[in-house]
């Protein structure tokens, strides 16, 4: 560990290192030096992100651009370089990075009230706005085709054909639900290909716990966990936030009668997001509801594909866990369809 701690340009000698936070992908530690300077030290999961150099280059480019937009150091993650001036260190075959600790900030797992949810929308909208003049072609796709729904359907059809465990017979209703929506769910990708919807810098994990809020004011400071920052549609980020933020139930709720999309929460998030992102194009605004529906559907499709394939991708904690997850997402999609006119009305009124 001492070799690792010596690898970074910390201010002072590190005196303590303890586990920090609750992320699933990377191991995170808080390091404090003898000058009482605090840093976040993180092991990068190179199984999930094999191109560590490309990933860290993305983060460096984005954070450097964001720094030009603010004088407040707490408003942007700040990478601590290694002693040989690199953005990450390799020690014993493991990849590590460090950030300055953001003082007087809090990170919430779930919103404690509607204001928290609204502020997360402002945070992600502001993130997109601040990066709207960034040359997005400079970024690599960390996970190629991450939200390419037609590509997800291609994998779905391949798995259906193989049906390794004979599970397809058990989920005919869910399969029918997907196939009926296949054409519509390719709309965003088609509009992206046709350049009707512009590529932007997208975050791709827009959960509340990826926003640091000011401890006193509860206003957003900065967006964190930039591993999946890459080119994409802002509708991906907006849609994913609605998918889990406006749902009335947990992602794996078995009792589908508890699952719906709250129009109130939809309205709160939409208002916050649009207010912070004034340069949304006319087309982007028009397709916001479809962003929410597509991201929710795509997530369900991935869960169903994994269930039929034998649960190889998502970690499961019970029999049929991925099927429960898929059904929850599809119930949300159906509820959005039932509330479609109201969703469009919310967007139009907010604009």
Language model features: what each stretch is:
Residues 18-22, 43, 49-53, 105-118, ...:
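ATP-dependent phospho-/nucleotidyl transfer catalytic cores
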Residues 280-292:
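All-alpha amphipathic helical-bundle segments outside canonical DNA-binding/catalytic cores
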Residues 235-278, 294-313:
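Active-site activation/catalytic loop segments of kinase-like enzymes and analogous catalytic loops
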Residues 230, 291-295:
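Transmembrane helix-bundle signature of multi-pass membrane transporters/permeases
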Residues 19-20, 24-39, 44-154, 158, ...:
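Conserved ATP-binding subdomain of kinase catalytic cores across diverse folds
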Residues 195, 209-250:
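Catalytic activation segment of kinase domains across protein kinase-like and atypical kinase folds
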